């Protein structure tokens, strides 16, 4: 035990980095286990869309949406979700909802808000449209 104490005292910065990483890892595990949504892959997204009538909700800007989006995706801004304006999603609360952004990071809050608003099956495309493109999945360009 004294050897550990001596090591930590001699390598204080290294020890603090390890403690910080451990705390961050624990926080990440707790956050993902308590999230109101689940993260899914591009393949799981296509299965939800094709087999369970899943709806893709793209929360990127209008310009980004026009440059390329998943087929049949619904474009809703995060500000609309925060305000409770769900548009065409309002009558699809029991259908699978897949929230998509560019990287999968900014969609987390929107996914949580949708789940809290009563949407029963909310998912998040893990790593966003970057993962979708890396899986060689198609994007539709233009207004839709």
Question: Can you describe what each PLM-predicted range is?
Answer:
Residues 45:
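Short, solvent-exposed loop/turn elements at beta->coil junctions and helix N-caps
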């Amino acid at each position: 035990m004294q050897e550990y104490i001596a090591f930590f005292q001699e390598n204080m910065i290294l020890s603090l980095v390890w403690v910080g990483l451990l705390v961050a890892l624990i926080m990440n595990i707790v956050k993902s286990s308590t999230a109101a949504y689940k993260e899914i892959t591009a393949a799981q997204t296509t299965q939800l869309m094709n087999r369970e009538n899943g709806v893709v909700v793209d929360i990127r800007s209008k310009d980004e949406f026009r440059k390329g989006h998943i087929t049949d995706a619904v474009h809703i801004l995060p500000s609309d979700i925060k305000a409770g304006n769900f548009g065409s999603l309002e009558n699809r609360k029991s259908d699978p909802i897949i929230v998509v952004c560019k990287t999968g990071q900014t969609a987390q809050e929107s996914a949580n808000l949708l789940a809290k608003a009563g949407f029963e099956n909310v998912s998040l495309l893990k790593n966003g449209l970057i993962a979708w493109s890396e899986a060689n999945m198609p994007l539709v360009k233009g207004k839709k």
